[in-house]
């Protein structure tokens, strides 16, 4: 993998674009493990976001029935089309945050770090069986954090409300070219059964975690505008907010179920839709 990536960089005089988060994975064993964790069948369709120079794409193409690879950089697309002769790979040019994803079973990607958050929230709106994704380590740690942890955040809540998530491998920065400033990690996500998924009001979760170390009721009072309340509304509803369930807990201690309790209370009191 190392020699393949560097031969292509040399051949095409390619300068990785830091604005697009181009840090190419160059360690074959890491790529092999990422593909193995996806447990790909030849009948399945795989989505890859940011194929880079195609080394992961090539391994996916050997196993899957179909691979959709979304790439924003026209230079990279030209290289992929010249260097590979895939019959089951469709390269889609565009911004992964803006285009509608095709139907897919699984998603396997070394994600551009600067779109980690929005692309994760977008993926959670799609039906898939498994996701094997490489993230910046700190972001991955937030995804798996539990109530009370220092990394527990809005991201932790919104992800774990929908999927089972595991951090399965830490990757040193030397596994990439150019070498990033931070380590990375492999995350595996599998959606929970529909009856176990919890739908949460995103504005409420944002309002709470805007002040993650404050008591739940105080956090909501300080972020009332994020709930769509005017100052006059807030004066009217302040006594109700003070009575929210779990008001004696700090936000970073709230479980997903606790947050759902707060949401249902506020909805019953007509504070949120």
From Swiss-Prot:
Does the keyword Cell membrane feature in the UniProt annotation? no
The main place the protein resides is cytoplasm
UniProt enzyme class: transferase
User: Looking at the UniProt record for this protein, which Gene Ontology cellular component terms does it annotate, in alphabetical order?
Assistant: cytoplasm
Annotated PROSITE patterns: RRNA_A_DIMETH (PS01131), SAM_RNA_A_N6_MT (PS51689)
Q: Which residues of the sequence carry a binding annotation for S-adenosyl-L-methionine?
A: 23, 25, 50, 71, 95, 110
Q: Which InterPro entries match?
A: KsgA/Erm, rRNA_Ade_diMease-like_C, rRNA_Ade_Mease_Trfase_CS, rRNA_Ade_methylase_Trfase_N, rRNA_adenine_dimethylase, SAM-dependent_MTases_sf
Where, per UniProt, does this protein localize?
Cytoplasm
| MF-aspect GO terms | RNA binding; rRNA (adenine-N6,N6-)-dimethyltransferase activity
Physiological role? Specifically dimethylates two adjacent adenosines in the loop of a conserved hairpin near the 3'-end of 16S rRNA in the 30S particle. May play a critical role in biogenesis of 30S subunits.
Q: Which family does it belong to?
A: Belongs to the class I-like SAM-binding methyltransferase superfamily. rRNA adenine N(6)-methyltransferase family. RsmA subfamily.
The name on file for this protein is Probable ribosomal RNA small subunit methyltransferase A
Name of the gene this protein is made from: rsmA
């Amino acid at each position: 993998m190392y020699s393949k990536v560097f031969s292509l960089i040399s051949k095409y005089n390619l300068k990785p674009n830091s604005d697009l988060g181009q840090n190419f994975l160059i360690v074959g064993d890491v790529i092999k493990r990422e593909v193995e964790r996806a447990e790909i069948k030849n009948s399945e369709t795989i989505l890859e976001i940011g194929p880079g120079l195609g080394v992961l794409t090539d391994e996916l193409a050997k196993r899957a029935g179909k691979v959709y690879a979304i790439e924003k950089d026209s230079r990279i697309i030209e290289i992929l089309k010249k260097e590979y002769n895939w019959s089951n790979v469709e390269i889609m040019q565009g911004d992964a945050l803006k285009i509608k994803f095709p139907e897919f079973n699984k998603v396997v990607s070394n994600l551009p770090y600067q779109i980690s958050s929005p692309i994760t929230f977008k993926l959670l709106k799609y039906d898939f069986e498994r996701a094997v994704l490489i993230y910046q380590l700190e972001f991955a740690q937030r995804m798996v954090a539990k109530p009370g942890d220092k990394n527990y955040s809005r991201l932790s809540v919104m992800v774990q409300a929908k999927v089972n998530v595991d951090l399965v491998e830490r990757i040193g920065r030397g596994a990439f070219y150019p070498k990033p400033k931070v380590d990375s990690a492999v995350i595996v996500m599998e959606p929970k059964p529909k009856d176990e998924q919890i739908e949460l009001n995103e504005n409420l979760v944002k309002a709470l975690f805007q002040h993650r170390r404050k008591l739940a009721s105080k956090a909501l009072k300080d972020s009332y505008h994020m709930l769509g309340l005017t100052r006059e509304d807030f004066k009217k509803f302040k006594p109700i907010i003070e009575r929210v369930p779990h008001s004696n807990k700090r936000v970073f201690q709230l479980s997903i179920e606790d947050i759902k309790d707060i949401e249902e209370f506020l909805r019953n009191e007509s504070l949120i839709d």
